[in-house]
Regions:
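FAD-binding core/adjacent interface of flavoenzyme oxidoreductases
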Residues: 1-7, 64-149, 218-224
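Beta1-alpha1 glycine-rich phosphate/pyrophosphate-binding loop at the start
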Residues: 2-74, 161-184, 188
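A general structural signal for well-ordered alpha-helical segments in protein cores
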Residues: 15, 44, 61, 114, ...
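Residue-level marker for beta-strand->alpha-helix junctions and adjacent short loops that shape enzyme
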Residues: 38, 111-112, 211
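Compact, aliphatic and Gly/Pro-tolerant "microcore" segments centered on a short helix or tight beta-hairpin
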Residues: 105, 117, 137-200
Length: 224
């Protein structure tokens, strides 16, 4: 029986689970992991705790350092899969390289939504908050008494707010919804969490939206 070649795009929880499941059923097949990050597999939900100083990069890892060696995985890190040629069973990378496969798993997770707001390109320091590099970059530019604006009062936005609130910075959250975490909590739950976060010097503008950025100043709608 010919061994299969498995290609996994992504290197987080789903990829780890896939590797372990493959090895339970196929000990000889080749596994290739492609990720646009340069890190060992880690827990993305913990990046806010990294900002808070409650964890470090080593503790964030899903598996031991020898996980890839033990499971005989070939790593392609720091490269992005741009296209899948299903007819030829190839993944085309951003450097032009092609990786063939017999079985392909896309395990990249979600991508942050970036709204189209006039002037956003003029903002000097702007970040999404889903990866370890995002958290490290944000931490590198945070200064004492700085003011941070977070667009969105969902789970990711609030975890970011919680993480940076301990850095002695002013944190402001703006959301179109009239309450925080509206997709997962009822009115009372939202109110309890909001009151708790306000004690950490986090300010909320709810039921509001940003209509324009003028360099590092945000212009909110007229509902003020």
């Amino acid at each position: 029986v010919n061994s299969l070649k498995y290609v996994i795009i992504g290197n987080s929880a789903a990829a780890v689970g896939a590797v372990e499941a493959i090895r339970k059923n196929d000990t000889g097949g080749r596994i290739v992991i492609i990720s646009n990050e340069n890190h060992h597999t880690y827990s993305r939900p913990l990046i806010s705790y990294l900002l808070m100083g409650k964890t470090d990069e080593e503790k964030m890892k899903y598996r031991d350092n020898d996980f890839y060696i033990e499971n005989r995985c070939d790593l392609i890190l720091g490269k992005t899969a741009l296209k899948i040629d299903d007819s030829r069973k190839q993944v085309i990378l951003d450097d032009g390289e092609k990786e063939s496969y017999d079985k392909l798993l896309i395990a990249t997770g979600s991508s942050p939504f970036i709204p189209l707001i006039e002037g956003l390109d003029s903002v000097r320091n702007k970040f999404t908050f889903t990866t370890l590099d995002n958290a490290k970059h944000l931490e590198s530019v945070l200064k004492e008494n700085a003011k941070v604006l977070i667009l969105g009062a969902g789970l990711i936005g609030l975890k970011c707010a919680e993480g940076i609130s301990r850095k002695n910075v002013k944190t402001i959250c703006v959301d179109l919804s009239t309450r925080i975490l509206s997709s997962i909590l009822d009115d009372e739950g939202s109110r309890i969490i909001e009151n708790h976060l306000k004690k950490s010097n986090i300010e909320f503008y709810l039921g509001r939206q940003i209509v324009e950025f003028k360099e590092n100043t945000a212009v909110l709608d007229s509902n003020i």
